[in-house]
Amino acid sequence: MSHNILIKTALKRQEAFRNLAKNLKTIKRTVHRVDPKAETYLFGSVSEKEHNYSSDIDILIITRLHPAKIHSELWKAGIKEPFEIHVHSPEKADFFKTRTKLVKI
């Protein structure tokens, strides 16, 4: 039984990576519909091109809106696992800007 769960999870992740460009467009469009001033970035192993199918897909969203609002809208748009959504204010986002490669979406 657990073998089937692992296979399902791997196939789901494979599909997310195969459709990465489409998913990133959906993320950007959804976030900008809620907050046109928001900035969206890809970071982590995917932005460094060091990922595999067990990697998550890290997304940084810089906005002054409450994170729950962004998470809710992305969930409705179908953005779920393996996407790891990090929502921060501009001040808190400075941490990411100094420690990792950010690729603007």
Language-model features: locations:
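Catalytic core of pol beta-like nucleotidyltransferases
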Residues: 1-41, 47-54, 62-105
